[in-house]
Amino acid sequence: MKRILLTNDDGFDSSGLLALKDALKDIAHVMVVAPASEKSACGHGLTLTRPLSFVQLDDDFYKLEDGTPSDCVYLALNTLYKASCKPDLVISGINLGSNMGEDITYSGTAAGAMEGCIQGVPSIAISQLMPDKNCSKHFDFSLAKECIYKITQLIFAKGFPLGERKFLNINIPHIKPKECKGYKITQMGYRIYADNAHLHRNPRGQEYYWLGLHPLEWEERNDMPHSYGSDFKATHEHYVSITPIKLDMTSYEDSSSLCEWIQL
């Protein structure tokens, strides 16, 4: 039977993670290793300055005390799995909210998939657009579950479609399954960020800040080398967005001009 490792950045008790586990339980042996608390926007951080420990909650279900999604994947692949029986797939999600455009550089969900592909395992990050996390407990993940089930079955049948150090980033629109127009292969769009630092004062008059969540605003890119639209546009038009992501962030098109510029 195929083996899948699941993680996320919303924490081990997230409704999105539990929905993901439920979607895949009949087609693979599923192990869950997730952070003990929410780690949203933690990026690809590894914990190097304090010890980490697993807490087993059920058969093949663990939380990692004070760990990040990258910690979860790294430790699971190097301790819970034997070298001869690594999982066939790492899936990070289902995130409560989108991970599109440059947001993936902040995303713990994307980082879980990044760590999987760094460790040599085909990996997927999947996120569900929603108005806010307050609605997540009663959210209907039917479309996301249907999508990840189909894509996982396709991977098992045909193999992973990307090469080394690349992963799939999937975003599910906030619509009912019957409203979905299908799937689109996309490119990362441009997220528009606004000043959303909120100044407050405690009872002693000391200032502190809360970083708010930016409204999901974006602009379509005009520098795309291919005809694919953006992840933002696809979900806005009621398509499931599937973006191939590579970890090599070298700007190759700038190499020649940089060589000329550096001649001092």
From Swiss-Prot:
Gene: surE
Residues bound to a divalent metal cation: D9, D10, S40, N95
InterPro entries the UniProt entry points to: SurE, SurE-like_Pase/nucleotidase, SurE-like_sf
EC id: 3.1.3.5
Signal peptide interval: none
Keywords: Cytoplasm, Hydrolase, Metal-binding, Nucleotide-binding
Function noted in UniProt: Nucleotidase that shows phosphatase activity on nucleoside 5'-monophosphates.
Record's keyword annotation contains Transcription regulation: no
Family membership noted in the UniProt record: Belongs to the SurE nucleotidase family.
Localization per Swiss-Prot or TrEMBL: Cytoplasm
Name the record gives this protein: 5'-nucleotidase SurE
Cellular component GO terms held in the UniProt record: cytoplasm
Origin superkingdom: Bacteria
GO molecular function: 3'-nucleotidase activity; 5'-nucleotidase activity; exopolyphosphatase activity; metal ion binding; nucleotide binding
SUPFAM superfamilies: SurE-like (SSF64167)
Cofactor(s) needed for function: a divalent metal cation
Lineage of origin: Bacteria, Pseudomonadati, Campylobacterota, Epsilonproteobacteria, Campylobacterales
Free-text cofactor note: Binds 1 divalent metal cation per subunit.
Catalytic activity: a ribonucleoside 5'-phosphate + H2O = a ribonucleoside + phosphate
